[in-house]
């Protein structure tokens, strides 16, 4: 194989790898309607006392609207997932299971207008919370 061909293949491979990495970062969060429904039930039972029944905030910060947008919009969904998993509930941090953090994240995303997808939210979910 000539040096020119070898360099061309290496360049094409590098460009393709960059495309894949960019595409993975650009994808939006994915969760199912079932996860959001389950998260809504858990939220009502365990989270609403601090964050309000409508996610409007009370003792804890609002999880919907401008306050949510300013903190989470455009960022990786895994950051929101990790925050919920590690710091909630405030009186028992790091007590949630991964599945609980996933359904709560799904519910919060749905309440903020992020549409459900066909893939269930995974642990350390890929993608971003879309900007408005």
Identify the role of each PLM range:
Residues 2-12:
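Bacterial N-terminal signal peptides that target proteins for export
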Residues 13-14, 24:
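Cleavable N-terminal signal peptides
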Residues 22-42, 92:
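Electrostatic cytochrome c docking/interface patches
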Residues 36, 56-89:
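Gly/Gly-Pro-rich "capping" loops immediately C-terminal to redox-active cysteine motifs
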Residues 39, 43-53, 104, 108:
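The canonical Cys-X-X-Cys-His
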Residues 91-132:
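Flexible coil segments in periplasmic/lumen-exposed cytochrome c-class electron-transfer proteins
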């Amino acid at each position: 194989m000539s040096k020119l061909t070898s360099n061309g293949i290496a360049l094409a491979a590098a460009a393709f790898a960059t495309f894949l990495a960019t595409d993975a970062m650009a994808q939006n969060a994915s969760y199912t309607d079932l996860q959001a429904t389950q998260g809504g039930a858990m939220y009502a039972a365990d989270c609403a006392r601090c964050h309000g029944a409508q996610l409007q905030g009370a003792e804890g910060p609002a999880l919907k609207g401008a306050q949510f947008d300013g903190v989470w919009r455009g960022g990786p969904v895994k950051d929101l997932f990790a925050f919920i998993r590690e710091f909630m509930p405030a009186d028992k941090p790091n007590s949630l299971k991964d599945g609980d953090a996933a359904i709560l994240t799904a519910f919060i995303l749905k309440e903020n207008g992020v549409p459900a997808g066909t893939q269930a939210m995974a642990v350390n979910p890929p993608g971003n919370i879309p900007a408005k």
